[in-house]
Amino acid sequence: MKTKTLRTEKVNVITLGCSKNKVDSENLITQLKGNDFDVSHETKQKSDIIIINTCGFIDLAKEESIQTILDYAERKKEGEIKKLFVTGCLSQRYKDDLEVEIPEVDAFFGTLEMPALLSRLNADFKHELVGERWISTPSHFAYLKIAEGCNRTCSFCAIPLMRGAHVSRNIEEILVEAKSLARRGVKELMLISQELTYYGLDTYKKRMLPDLLSQLAKIEGIEWIRLHYAYPSKFPLEIFDVMAAEPKICNYLDMPLQHAQNEVLTRMRRQITVEETKELLQTARQIVPNITLRSTFLVGFPGETENEFQELCDFIEEASLDRVGVFTYSHEESTRAHDMEDDIPNELKMERANRIMEIQSAISFEKNKSKIGKTLKVLFDKIENGHYVGRTEGDSPEVDNEVLVPLKGNYARIGDFADVFITDASEYDLIGVINKIN
């Protein structure tokens, strides 16, 4: 048997930003490995070539991306690395400016320019590797991107400027990738795109997410399928029917609502009212009684009055969502909202974000306390600080609650499902003991 000879230059890929960027980096690494590169992901070891996959979503993300580029540009000047390439959303949006400001970078590439990046490295884009993605997550779960881009025109959002229009992947291609992941031990798939519920409208002329879910649920080895980034306007209610009928589809929905005051929603161009939102949440809970609802909200949008913000607070208390995240408004150039005055001081934006999280913390604590004395199915992700750390069906990695099980007196392996008896709870964690490994 022949031994593969790797290229002598070592490549390190750095990923910043969201799970969609993570998938892009994983696909890039797959192509580099297929071209015989010795490639690592975010290694501390010495590397010859650095590729930074950037985020340009909001100011904080842009600052992190720029600082990371500058750090590696300095290391290149000092001779620690030979080549520095930048790709991703920041590069897509500000390529011309970045080329002038950071000349140490050998080349900048946009979000859809992987073939050009590979060509710069004297490598080929290998179509046969599509669907055979290397994953950077623990081996038992993976993100599965079903579409790219977004057709929405939310006034605050720059994503369409960086990711382009919505393009759905072919169902057969998605299934091939999902089956490949399952063969390699993946048990949980997290479906992602900029707008999950739009899937299929461009290529199949109808919303195809329910059909895709039904087919993914047939794949042997996959036990959990989780839905991220659904858009509330014109939500296809058939998704709830599939969720209720198919045990593999997690009773979990991540649906960013952004706000809950009608005038603000209009200024945001969200194409939905508070009344319609409440009706959608009620329908979800009627069809899937034990559904976990996650959402994110945006505070400090231009013109947001104290009364408008209070209506948002009242909604969050009334809706009693299971998981909530908050962003403060970032005044993004070239968006429709950029023409409005960014009139909310940063201190007030942060104060409002903190007030939302105080409300949600109390809601989360009450919901978690109600789980004490119950036995829940848990998937273990890691060992940390003397505990197995896992998640329930109602929790996604990194952003949601965790279940902590002491190492002493319990035994499990990473990637195991187990029945865990809950003995205690805090605002964002559950504590328990293992009853049975599944």
Task: Spell out what each predicted region is.
Residues S193, Y229, L257-H259, S295-V299, ...:
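Active-site proximal loops enriched in glycine and acidic residues that flank catalytic Cys/His/Asp
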Residues P115, R152, T197, N262-E263, ...:
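Glycine-centered loop/turn positions within well-structured domains
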Residues I102-P103, D124-K126, R207-L209, M243-A245, ...:
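Short, hinge-like loop/turn segments at secondary-structure boundaries
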Residues C18, G200-G221, M268, H331-A362:
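Radical SAM enzyme [4Fe-4S]-AdoMet core and its adjacent flexible, acidic
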Residues M1-Y199, E238, I249, L253, ...:
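Proteins enriched for Cys/Gly/acidic motifs involved in redox and nucleic-acid/cofactor modification
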Residues D339-N438:
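Terminal RNA-binding accessory module
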Residues K82-G88, R93, L98, R183-N307, ...:
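Conserved SAM/AdoMet-binding glycine-rich loop
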Residues C154, I174, L191, L227, ...:
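Conserved, mostly hydrophobic/aromatic
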